[in-house]
Design a protein with these regions (language model features):
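Preference for long, solvent-exposed alpha-helical segments and helix-linker "stalks"
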Residues: 1-178
Length: 178
């Protein structure tokens, strides 16, 4: 088990003084702050750790690129840790994942695609977006996964496809009355 409490003492100065030194600085930093967040009991502290994780994703993009891919990780993390804190976090996660998918297109990770549809449906259920938007989101997601299945079929992609199909079917967003 990693000793993050000790590790942060040497990590922080490197992060502050040499932010472009290594992508691993960000990978390790995110792991470390996720551990802190998941073991914290105070809500304000958990939220501060989540904010730090978001900042680390942004800095990783700034120094090492891979914007679409890293935005996918950022959107997943935001929704994992803040989804239950209010619809504004779902909206923010949805927008981050949408941008990730627009950049990555057929290289989008299946988890990003599935979570994007889940967020879209959540926003529809909360009357934040119309069913037409959910349908457009589903079409985009479905096309990405179909293209991935054509290029290199895998059970992971097939499960993602089945998951978005089930979620969209269960959501009632496809009704003619909506």
């Amino acid at each position: 088990h990693k000793n993050f409490k000790d590790a942060i003492l040497s990590w922080r100065p490197v992060f502050n003084e040499c932010p472009a030194s290594s992508k691993n600085l960000y990978l390790f930093g995110i792991d470390m702050y996720k551990n802190f967040l998941e073991t914290a009991s105070d809500v304000a502290i958990k939220n501060a750790y989540c904010d730090t994780i978001m900042m680390l994703h942004d800095r990783r993009i700034k120094y090492f690129g891979e914007e679409g891919k890293v935005l996918g990780y950022k959107g997943i993390d935001l929704l994992r840790y803040r989804r239950s804190d209010g619809v504004e976090f779902i909206k923010q996660g949805y927008e981050i994942l949408k941008k990730s998918m627009e950049i990555e297109n057929v290289k989008s990770q299946p988890a990003v695609v599935v979570l994007y549809i889940t967020a879209s449906i959540s926003l529809f259920m909360d009357k934040q977006i119309q069913n037409e938007q959910v349908i457009n989101d589903y079409i985009m997601a479905s096309e990405i996964l179909d293209e991935q299945l054509k290029k290199s079929p895998s059970s992971k992609i097939q499960q993602a496809k089945e998951s978005i199909n089930k979620n969209i079917s269960d959501s009632k967003a496809l009704t003619c009355e909506a």
